Amino acid sequence: MSEPRNVRYVTIRAVLFDFSGTLFRLEHDSLAAHAGLMRALTAPVGLADGLDIDPAQWERRDLDPDAHRDMHLAVLAKAGAKDPAKFYADLCSPPFWQPYPDTAQALGTELPTAVVSNIAWDISAVFARHGVENRVDEFVLSYQEGFVKPDPKIFRIACDRLGVHPTEALMIGDSAEADGGAAAVGCQVEIVEPLPTGSRPEALLQVLRKHI
């Protein structure tokens, strides 16, 4: 059977990963009672229902560490958190972030790899805690770059630093709205579900097998 016409096959030469809900998930016994609030606070874009706060300010939280802290403390206080400051510190603490079972293997493809995240703190410590920081070539973080996903600029930055054209990169994330922005610059995009780590054993590897 002949190949379909006008189909372009591109070799993937680099992989871009989202952080929260893709490679790692905020999970800790002390946070179990606040699962709904955790989902709202770690959503990559948008303002979750029930968070009484200025949407414009919330959208900019991942561009400035001080604003990130202030906004989260305000939300936590309104949600009735007993100690908002400690709660916020836990959200930014490596021990509270757990890797998915296939994270280490997914980061070991030998292709150039970047983590592209809407975040306002240095997540490299999370990777270091689990011994995989050396498997990431570039951390492209919104608060350092001045752009948040789905802005195409942040994906271009990641591809430029890895030395590949966007059409040669695969973006893997958990949000079609945020991570799907990579398609605007030509990246291939795959979305995984941000399930609890114990419920998603090899979604990353399944995606990688489709493309690499």
Region annotations inferred by a language model:
Residues 3-102, 108, 121-124:
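N-terminal helical cap/lid subdomain that shapes the substrate entry/recognition surface
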Residues 1-15, 25, 82, 104-108, ...:
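Asp-based, Mg2+/Mn2+-dependent phosphohydrolase catalytic module
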